[in-house]
């Protein structure tokens, strides 16, 4: 489903149903042509908010009941009355009449009682059962209105009389005689009962039903042109003081009843007679009014006349009706389906179609990309270049905005005729483009990379590379937005300019040449002491110091002649020499340590034994071997040595026997240690041997071991 929508001044107007939106078919035709209708996009995308919301030929009038649950419409052909039930979204019933309807009004809150003015001078009263009563008036009627206060029905006709029919008594009363012939429209003020009659001249007569006399006449002036015009419609606002009327030349007048001068005069724009005026008081926006002619229905502000929205169907409008409290409008028009419009900004959708709020955006008509998929847009200059000026105005060139649409195939043929080498040139350009792309993708050496040329503002590039890095600076140089700043001399930054100095009053030390020389880091106190110690160790520190003093004494005259800058440079040179010597010394130490580590190798067990055996006698060596073997047998332990001198000892733990004398002596020694006597015979301080208090709680886990 697709909803047609228009948007102006950020106000969306959705056409829910009507011409070019929905298309209904009889059930038997739909079943018979079921396969064909599957491919019919217009039928598949139809929207039917209310079922059978249409007439066989055209619709004349449409009104909504006061309770908002029903809608009554009249149309042709054949002349008939339709009543729609909003609760079921369908047609409740239809009735045929003898003559075509001119105007009607609903007497009850629902659809059960209504009065219809027909074009054969008859007035019909309809109720639930059908036609209740019919009467006639002397002349052809044009409009009618009902006064709820005194039950009078006022009928305007082609004569100079305003007919009165009292529905309580059931008889005609004396008519109101007007000064002019022909009453086009009659309306009544719901607040004070004032009656207004728009005549065939530019006069509106006001009558008081209570006194049955004329109250006043309102003469409408036409300052635009001097042509005669008629008053075609009238309407009172619910405040009782504001009155509006429409004319046959397409103008709407808004008056305050306390003055004879109009507050607003609004031109409809098409010159057709105004058919109806509706005050939009109970909607989301205030001070809005609807004026309708046969071409368009416009919504505008009654205070300043500013346009708000518009509804323009593709057929002529006969009548328009607003659903109170919502943003929905119904139109009776010269086509089979009646139109339904929905404006969300004016108010929500009615309760009986609350789903409309959620689906309007989803079903909104989107612009299709395939409409002009086979067409190409060309300007007027392109038309001249292609020698197609003789086709302007034909179907080949479809005018659109500032150019034309032309078929794509035709454009290719015409452009080939106008420029025979176009294909060849395009082919060469494409080949060149692909070759350049392949060259860019190849791996290049660092020397082959083309650096961006910097003609001006080199200092700015250096600052940028220091702050953000070379990568960011390179991107800035290649960016189309900024690269002219480093190529065009007009973008050169003038550092001597007054404004530049105001923004940059002081340069940092890093930006000056003297600062660059002073940026060499001085030696710390620890580094200077290390340097002096090494110099004294090598025996050159005192000599260098004396040489420096002698050189300074001999060159006193020369140094007095040198400037302060040269003295600073000599000091800097000395510091640089010291730093250089320190770096070389650390480098030598590192090389020596690496050489020592590479030369050092772990000796094997046999080599160590050979070195030791050179100072030990043969008998001692045999004794040691026997002791080792006896220890292995007794302890059942194994000692293994690898090539790097590492040893691995494997043994089985055993408890010493008490018979062993060594054990006793060792035990005795340990006991002496436990008693707290050291090697010199002094008593050791091993801490407190008894608790400070008896029966003191102990936190150890072995507290109950002695129990």
UniProtKB/Swiss-Prot annotation:
Keyword Phosphoprotein in annotation: yes
UniProt biased composition (Basic and acidic residues): 532-544, 559-598, 629-647, 659-671, 680-697
Compartmental location: Nucleus, Nucleolus
Keywords from the named record: Nucleus, Phosphoprotein, Repeat, Ribosome biogenesis, rRNA processing, WD repeat
Record InterPro entries: Beta-prop_NOL10_N, NOL10/Enp2, NOL10_2nd, NUC153, WD40/YVTN_repeat-like_dom_sf, WD40_repeat_dom_sf, WD40_rpt
Modification Phosphoserine, positions: 529, 550, 555
Region feature Disordered, mapped onto this chain: 523-707
SUPFAM superfamilies on file: WD40 repeat-like (SSF50978)
WD repeat coordinates: 54-94, 178-217, 226-265, 269-310, 312-351
GO cellular component, one term: 90S preribosome
Sequence ranges of Acidic residues compositional bias: 545-558
SMART domains: WD40 (SM00320)
Keyword hit for Phosphoprotein: yes
One GO BP annotation of this record: ribosomal small subunit biogenesis
Family: Belongs to the WD repeat NOL10/ENP2 family.
Annotated PANTHER family: NUCLEOLAR PROTEIN 10
Subunit structure: Component of the 90S pre-ribosomes.
Job description of the protein: May be involved in rRNA-processing and ribosome biosynthesis.
Protein's recorded name: Ribosome biogenesis protein ENP2
Biological source species: Saccharomyces cerevisiae (strain ATCC 204508 / S288c) (Baker's yeast)
Lineage: Eukaryota, Fungi, Dikarya, Ascomycota, Saccharomycotina
């Amino acid at each position: 489903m697709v909803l047609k929508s228009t948007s102006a001044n950020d106000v969306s107007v959705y056409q829910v149903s009507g011409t070019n939106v929905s298309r209904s078919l009889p059930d038997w035709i739909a079943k018979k042509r079921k396969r064909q209708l599957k491919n019919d996009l217009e039928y598949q995308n139809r929207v039917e908010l209310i079922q059978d919301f249409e007439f066989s030929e055209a619709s004349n009038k449409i009104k909504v009941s006061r309770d908002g649950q029903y809608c009554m419409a009249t149309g042709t052909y054949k002349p008939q009355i339709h009543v729609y039930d909003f609760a079921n979204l369908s047609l409740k019933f239809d009735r045929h009449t003898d003559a075509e309807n001119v105007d009607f009004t609903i007497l009850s809150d629902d659809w059960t009682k209504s009065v219809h003015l027909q074009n054969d001078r008859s007035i019909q009263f309809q109720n639930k059962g059908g036609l209740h009563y019919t009467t006639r008036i002397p002349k052809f009627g044009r409009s009618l209105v009902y006064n709820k206060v005194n039950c009078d029905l006022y009928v305007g006709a082609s004569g100079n009389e305003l007919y009165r029919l009292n529905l309580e008594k059931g008889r005609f009363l004396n008519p109101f005689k007007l000064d002019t012939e022909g009453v086009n429209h009659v309306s009544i003020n719901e607040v004070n009962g004032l009656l207004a009659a728009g005549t065939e001249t530019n006069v509106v007569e006001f009558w008081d039903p209570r006194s049955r006399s004329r109250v006043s006449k309102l003469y409408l002036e036409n300052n635009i042109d001097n042509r005669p015009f008629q008053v075609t419609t009238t309407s009172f606002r619910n405040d009782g003081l504001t009155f509006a009327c429409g004319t046959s030349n397409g103008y709407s007048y808004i008056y305050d009843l306390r003055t004879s001068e109009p507050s607003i005069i609004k031109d409809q724009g098409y010159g057709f007679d105004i058919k109806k005026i509706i005050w939009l008081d109970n909607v989301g926006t205030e001070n809005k009014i609807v004026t309708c002619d046969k071409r368009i229905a416009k919504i505008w502000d009654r205070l300043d006349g500013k346009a708000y929205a518009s509804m323009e169907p593709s057929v002529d409008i006969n009548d328009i009706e607003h659903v109170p409290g919502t943003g929905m409008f119904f139109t009776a028009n010269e086509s089979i389906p009646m139109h339904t419009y929905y404006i969300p900004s004016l108010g929500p959708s009615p309760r009986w179609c609350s789903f409309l709020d959620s689906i309007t955006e989803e079903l909104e008509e989107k612009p299709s990309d395939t409409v002009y998929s086979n067409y190409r847009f060309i300007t007027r200059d392109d038309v001249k270049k292609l020698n197609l000026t003789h086709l302007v105005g034909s179907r080949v060139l479809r005018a659109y905005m500032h150019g034309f649409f032309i078929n794509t195939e035709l454009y290719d043929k015409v452009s080939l005729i106008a420029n025979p080498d176009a294909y060849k040139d395009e082919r060469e350009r494409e080949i060149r483009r692909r070759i350049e792309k392949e060259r860019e993708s190849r791996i290049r050496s660092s020397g082959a990379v083309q650096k961006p040329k910097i003609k001006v503002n080199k200092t700015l590039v250096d600052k940028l590379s220091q702050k953000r890095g070379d990568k960011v600076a390179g991107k800035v140089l290649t960016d189309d937005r900024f690269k002219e700043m480093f190529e065009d001399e007009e973008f050169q930054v003038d550092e001597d300019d007054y404004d530049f100095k105001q923004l940059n009053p002081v340069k940092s030390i890093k930006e000056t040449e003297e600062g660059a020389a002073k940026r060499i880091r001085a030696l710390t106190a620890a580094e200077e002491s290390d340097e002096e110690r090494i110099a004294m160790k090598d025996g050159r520190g005192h000599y260098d110091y004396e040489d420096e003093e002698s050189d300074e004494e001999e060159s006193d005259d020369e140094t007095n002649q040198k400037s302060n800058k040269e003295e600073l440079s000599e000091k800097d040179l000395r510091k640089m020499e010291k730093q250089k010597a320190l770096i070389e010394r650390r480098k030598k130490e590192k090389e020596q340590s690496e050489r020592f580590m590479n030369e050092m190798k772990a000796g094997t067990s046999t080599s160590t034994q050979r070195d030791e055996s050179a100072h030990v006698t043969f008998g001692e060596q045999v004794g040691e071997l026997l002791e080792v073997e006896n220890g292995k047998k007794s302890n059942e332990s194994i000692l293994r040595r690898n090539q790097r001198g590492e040893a691995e000892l494997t043994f089985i733990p055993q408890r010493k026997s008490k018979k062993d004398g060594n054990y006793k002596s060792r035990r005795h020694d340990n006991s002496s240690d436990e008693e707290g006597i050291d090697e010199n015979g002094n008593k050791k301080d091993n801490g407190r041997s008894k608790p400070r208090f008896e029966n003191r709680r102990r936190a150890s886990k072995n507290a109950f071991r002695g129990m």
